[in-house]
UniProtKB/Swiss-Prot annotation:
This is Histidine ammonia-lyase. Belongs to the PAL/histidase family. GO terms for cellular component: cytoplasm. Contains an active site 4-methylidene-imidazol-5-one (MIO), which is formed autocatalytically by cyclization and dehydration of residues Ala-Ser-Gly. Keywords: Cytoplasm, Histidine metabolism, Lyase. The gene is hutH. It comes from Symbiobacterium thermophilum (strain DSM 24528 / JCM 14929 / IAM 14863 / T).
Length: 507
């Protein structure tokens, strides 16, 4: 991907390109000019000693405490230090890179009062490969992601920790390694850096991308299972779908028809049975519902990726500063709870398909897909693992956004818990990726008994991609590496790419 331009409409593929693939980020002269106007306004407010929250006053419960011009720099530095109290394991580098990009995008809109040189340093972190160390726990999701963003910002002033070329360093040493010097923050800058929803949105945007891959993967895995079990694709007929106006259902049915077109394994009604069980017959309805939910999440996150979410906001054209609540993460929190539920359901139905594959009473195939049952257990325990993962997801799918707890002496008396929702959704997605990997493993093995050469062209491509990484099961072996290999095949998009090279783009 070409360089990502700050200040233009930021897209999900651009976030992924910067976060995961190191795409460069550029600042245009227009963005610098916009940012400078708001910064000049802040300087004037300080000179005029106008009472403005976070610029000439303290924060939270201390919002009525006046701050002199001489205390401005200390106020901003103290803000970063005092708010950097997150705990837990560090967020993944890709998440922190997404945070940096999203915070820079919000600041580039010119309503935050940050200086151009401070924004340029955030961009330099991305382009030079300096990744702040950000612990994952400690955000309430209002006022934004204060603690995570404080940790993200500490290296700007030579504090905290950062990773450069895989080495974890002090903030000061990390700056030195990449040829940068610490900044001295001026009025409003500390607050502008940490008051926003970028931790939850970073986690959510990368999770959304992965969920979109899982949607296609779930259709591919289900199509392979359907062929292995001699399913009846009549249930996916477009005339059936047209009588229900859910677009996600219709898209899922189109995918399934495309994936199984040309199959010599699927059957007609009455050929083997009159109708299939729900896990095969209702695939468009279940996968489609998740698809519709994820499309809603995509819209919410697209808005949030391009939002200005700090407080107060400056409007230089009107010479006005307004204290608002754009930092409140409730829209994102609700969406990410929805994301977790939608993806968890993809795993729930996949686990039931796995059971149909390994259970001889349901499949008509050898028990646990091994030719020598008794001495060999075959794929018996893979279903246990899938059952464990989907059961864990039932706990993780409990919504975080219905919770709230007051903070800052009850000044900040309702919070979103959006970053908790984001972290849970990320784990649900990782779990479902492995559930689908197990289904792919089982479906490919089941096909060894019915003839993979009879697969549809699209699912034959999926089978070939699987067999490049995992051999057929001839006897018992350690299966954990097989599951992880197929989970990576899903995660890196290679399975979907192999299928789409034959079938064309899936929806």
């Amino acid at each position: 991907m070409e360089a990502v331009e700050l200040g233009a409409h930021l897209t999900l593929p651009e976030v992924v390109a910067v976060a995961r693939h190191g795409a460069r980020v550029v600042l245009t002269p227009e963005v610098r000019q916009r940012v400078a106007r708001a910064s000049e306004m802040v300087e004037r407010l300080v000179r005029e000693r106008r009472p403005v929250y976070g610029i000439t006053t303290g924060f939270g419960k201390f919002s009525d405490v006046p701050i002199s011009a001489e205390q401005t720099e200390a106020l901003q530095r103290n803000l970063l230090m005092s708010h950097a109290c997150a705990v837990g394991e560090p967020l993944a580098a890709e998440v922190v890179r997404a945070m940096l990009l999203l915070r820079a995008q919000a600041l580039s809109r010119g309503h935050s009062g940050i200086r151009a040189e401070t924004l340029e340093m955030l961009v330099a972190f991305l382009n030079l490969g300096l990744t702040p160390v950000v612990p994952e726990q400690g955000s309430l999701g209002a006022s934004g992601d204060l603690a995570p963003l404080a940790h993200m910002s500490l290296p700007l002033i030579g504090l905290g920790e950062a990773v450069v070329n895989g080495e974890r360093l002090s903030g000061a040493e990390a700056l030195q390694r990449v040829g940068l010097r610490p900044l001295t923050l001026t009025a409003k800058e500390g607050l502008a850096l940490i008051n926003g929803t970028q931790a939850m949105t970073a986690l959510g945007s990368l999770g959304l991308h992965d969920a979109q891959v899982l949607l296609k993967t779930a259709d591919i895995a289900a199509a392979m299972t359907a062929e292995a079990l001699g399913a009846i694709p009549a249930a996916w007929d477009p005339r059936v779908q047209a009588l229900r106006l859910h677009t996600g259902q219709q898209a899922a049915a189109r995918n399934l028809r495309r994936l199984t077109e040309g199959s010599r394994l699927t059957t007609r009604p009455g050929q083997m049975r009159t109708q299939d069980p729900y896990t095969l017959r209702c695939l468009p309805q279940v996968h489609g519902a998740s698809r519709t939910a994820i499309e809603h999440v995509a819209q919410v996150l697209d808005w949030e990726m391009n939002a200005v979410t700090d407080n107060p906001l400056l409007f230089p054209d009107d010479d006005e500063v307004i204290s608002g609540g754009n930092f409140h993460g409730q829209p994102v929190a609700l969406a990410l709870d929805y994301l977790a539920i939608a993806v968890a359901e993809l795993g729930d139905i996949a686990e039931r398909r796995i059971e149909r594959l390994v259970n001889p009473q349901l499949s008509g195939l050898p028990a646990f897909l091994t030719r020598n049952g008794g001495v060999h257990s075959g794929l018996m325990i893979t279903q246990y693992t899938a059952a464990s993962l989907v059961s864990e997801n039932k706990v993780l799918a409990h919504p975080a956004s219905v919770d709230s707890i007051p903070s800052s002496a009850n000044q900040e008396d309702h919070v979103s818990m959006g970053t908790t929702a984001a972290r849970k959704a990320r784990q649900v997605i990782a779990n479902v990726r492995r559930v689908l990997a197990i289904e792919l493993l089982c479906a490919a093995q089941a096909l060894e008994f019915v003839g993979p050469e009879r697969l549809a062209p699209a699912t034959r491509a999926a089978y070939a991609a699987i067999r490049e990484r995992v051999a057929p099961l001839s006897g018992d072996r350690v299966l954990a590496p097989d599951i992880e290999a197929l989970a990576e095949l899903v995660h890196n998009g290679e399975l979907v790419a192999a299928v789409e090279a034959v079938a064309g783009p899936l929806e």
